Amino acid sequence: RGYSNLDRFGCLDSDGDGWSDVDPGGLDGVEPWFAHPNGSADAFPFTPSQWNDTDEDGFGDNWADGSWNETRMNWSIGVWYANASQPDACPFVTGFSVEDRFGCPDADNDGWSDPDSNWTASNGADAFPDNPTQWSDRDNDGWGDNQSEGALQVDDFPDNPTQWLDTDGDGWGDNNSYGATQVDDFPLIPSQYRDTDGDGYGDDINGFEGDVCPLSTVEEVESGWIS
């Protein structure tokens, strides 16, 4: 007993979407009935909002985003369906991304799709498509936002595009190039980060070799009268 009425009539339709379940063994006594795209049966027998899967990656051709309507209708695959489950953003290309969009190529298998001409890192694609431990770079400096244990190419300053490494872990960055901010004058000494008078001794009196006179003038420092 069944109630399918779209691909064939009167066959089992577990999710009630009108598309019959697969019957590869010909148990109906007629002939094998394969799932789309190899046949017309429901590729998602337990998901009523999906039934076709053109690229066979496990993500359906139907979509829920109305902005896709014109393009998808021109492609003649799938239909708009309110709250469609896991709509394939790349219906002609096999892919397994699940984070920023469903069903697109994901070279490093971290869940975030590889960027392409229509979907870049600024849209949500993987900013590091070959590094499975990184995917986002909100300050666009080439170092990743993920700071979890084991992550590579970690940005110690994810919101400062002029800094990325903090070797001594004091919250001040190693990069001292022109224009950089939050610069550590002592990148290897965690108890010092600023040297206001440029004499090589840190301003923090309680830190390593703290400067007793942190505001000495250039002339005083250069003359050696005071440090």
Sequence positions of predicted segments:
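Extracellular calcium-associated, cysteine-rich motifs in secreted modular proteins
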Residues: 1-227
